[in-house]
Design a protein with these regions (language model features):
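Bacterial N-terminal signal peptides that target proteins for export
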Residues: 1-7
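Bacterial N-terminal signal peptides
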Residues: 8-16
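Active-site segment of extracytoplasmic enzymes that catalyze sulfate/phosphate-ester chemistry
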Residues: 21, 38-39, 46-147, 152, ...
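Loop/turn elements at helix/coil->beta-strand transitions in domains of secreted/extracellular proteins
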Residues: 32-37, 75-80, 155-161, 181-184, ...
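Substrate-binding rim/cap in mid-to-C-terminal beta-strand-loop elements of soluble/periplasmic
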Residues: 75, 96, 194-198, 300-308, ...
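Formylglycine-dependent
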Residues: 111-159, 166-253, 259-268, 282-283, ...
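Metal-dependent active-site segment of extracytoplasmic phospho-/sulfohydrolases and closely related
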Residues: 251-253, 258-259, 294-332
Length: 364
């Protein structure tokens, strides 16, 4: 298969123009089809990397260490003016259906069924929106019904793997489960758009009896409870196990590696946190940097797996974030509010450029 055509197909699903690409894809031969890894980072700003996406390195580019992002960039394309929606659910619903968010109308965070997450206003009457997310089947109110490009991949012979954050549909709706969208394997994906904690010492948000103490508790990682393994690393290990199994199926794979990092809470990844303190970052900023480098290590581990298994030359890797970087949470970031994506204004949740500009790259 033409790899440039397929990467266009996957990228087009973000913009809602995937129909023609789907038709071309279905007409291709089934021999030597490339694997696909879509590596999604949560809340990663355009400067949250040592790789500059501007004409010069910024202060944040100098502060962070992301050698595997640099490694990926050497092998592929960089998109220096990449944009997403300003919040995760809108971007992710567009991704899975190929529909622009102005059409699917998932315009705020989704979580609980039939409950809006809009702030109440005494002066503005807010319009109705699809707060139950998206689905492939009719029957749920305030839901956009669309076709999953993952299901199309599965139907054409791909082994499909979801690992990490989903955030496609509200709790107790069909769309909350990645299996509904054509993923044959679901690792830790559910309705929530965040996480309770990255820490295995807190069982990723579960009590000792196994019950979640938060709607944001990460499911499916029970084998790592109490082991000291950070959530980012646990997800990476499970993804690699799934790839090891996929090798035996004699079919191409699609891995959606959808990290919860670098979403709040900004827990310290102790594999990297001390290094950033020594570099002079504050405790909050060092913790933030540790999440970034932990995610970068995950990217490197997956690339190493491809090299080890002779799949690197037959795998498309697409790297992106779901919205702009965090810039309005003084509990988690130091510095003046709305400046963490400077010279762009504001960040996640805002319609200023800091809220919608993200990092994009692809290895074809």
């Amino acid at each position: 298969m033409n790899k440039k055509l397929l990467v266009s197909f996957v990228l087009a699903s973000l913009t809602g123009i995937s129909t023609q690409a789907k038709e071309k894809m279905s007409s291709e031969t089934t021999q030597q089809r490339p694997n696909i890894i879509l590596f999604m980072v949560d809340d990663m700003g355009w400067q949250d990397t040592s790789l500059p996406f501007w004409t010069q390195k910024t202060h944040y580019n100098e502060a962070y260490e992301t050698p595997n992002m640099e490694r990926l960039a050497q092998k592929g394309m960089m998109f220096t003016q990449a944009y997403a929606c300003n919040i995760s659910s809108a971007t992710r619903c567009s991704l899975i259906t190929g529909v622009n968010n102005a059409r699917h109308r998932v315009t705020n965070w989704t979580l609980e069924r039939d409950k809006t997450t809009d702030r109440q206003s005494e002066t503005v009457q807010l319009p109705d929106w699809n707060y139950n997310g998206v689905s492939q089947v009719e029957g749920t109110p305030n839901t956009f019904v669309g076709t999953s490009f993952v299901d199309l991949l599965r139907q054409s012979g791909y082994h499909t793997i979801h690992c990490g954050k989903a955030h496609f549909g509200s709790i107790d709706t069909p769309g909350e489960n990645p299996n509904h969208w054509g993923f044959e394997v679901n690792i830790a994906g559910h309705a929530a758009g965040g996480l309770a904690t990255y820490l295995s010492e807190k069982n990723y948000g579960h009590k000792r009896d196994g019950q979640p103490y938060s709607l944001m508790a990460i499911p499916g990682l029970e084998n790592y409870w109490g082991t000291g393994v950070f959530a980012t690393e646990a997800l990476t290990r499970e993804a690699i196990k799934a790839l090891d199994k996929a090798k035996k199926y004699n079919q191409p794979f699609y891995l959606y590696m959808s990290h919860y990092a670098i979403h709040i809470p900004i827990d310290k990844d102790m594999r990297f946190y001390p290094k950033y303190l020594k570099k002079g970052l504050t405790e909050k900023e060092a913790a933030y940097a540790s999440l970034i480098e932990g995610m970068d290590k995950s990217l490197g581990d997956l690339m190493d797996w491809l090299d080890k298994n002779d799949e690197a030359d037959n795998t498309i890797i697409i790297f992106m974030s779901d919205n702009g970087g965090l810039a309005s949470e003084p509990a988690w970031r130091d510095g003046e509010l709305h400046t963490q994506n400077y010279p762009l204004n504001s960040g996640k949740g805002s319609l200023y450029e800091g809220g919608i500009r993200e990092i994009g790259r692809a290895h074809v």
